[in-house]
Amino acid sequence: RLATKTRTLDPTRLIGAALEQSSFEGSATVKTIHDPFANVVDILSFNQYIGWYEGLPERSKEITWKIDINKPVIISEFGAGAKKGLHGEKTTRWTEEFQEYLYEETLKMIDQIDQLQGISPWILVDFRSPRRPLPEIQDGWNRKGLISDDGQKKKAFFVLQNYYNNKN
């Protein structure tokens, strides 16, 4: 009913719903999208955290996507946390190198989605979040930003900037 009402108010506005409705069905490397609202929405949208909540960034190299619904796709969230100025190996969580590596691998992976029409990295700037208590890393901040809370660009910012600059 909400989609119907929205279309009566503004028939030009596209409708989507960001869902995490994907699974590995029959294969550990094929992620299948299931969208219970597919018959209602104009855009398929889902959050994607392979390499952050699901394994390490190199896991992205193995993944392909199965999307049988013929609609445009927008990745509504993806990313990883990094504390500005914390450096180390690219496989060490919370370092700028880890976040940078995750962005590199994620962008290569999602570019293989035929219907991909847009992405929304999570998130541009670190922000206060009381549910982020990890001492000396989070300290009450969501650190998934590409820019630190004091305005400094993290390494992953430049990966995304380069990605956009190379798009036609």
Where on the chain are the PLM-derived regions?
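Non-catalytic beta-sheet/beta-sandwich ligand-binding modules that flank or precede catalytic cores
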Residues: 29
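Substrate-binding clefts and catalytic carboxylate motifs of secreted carbohydrate-active enzymes
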Residues: 2-26, 34-168
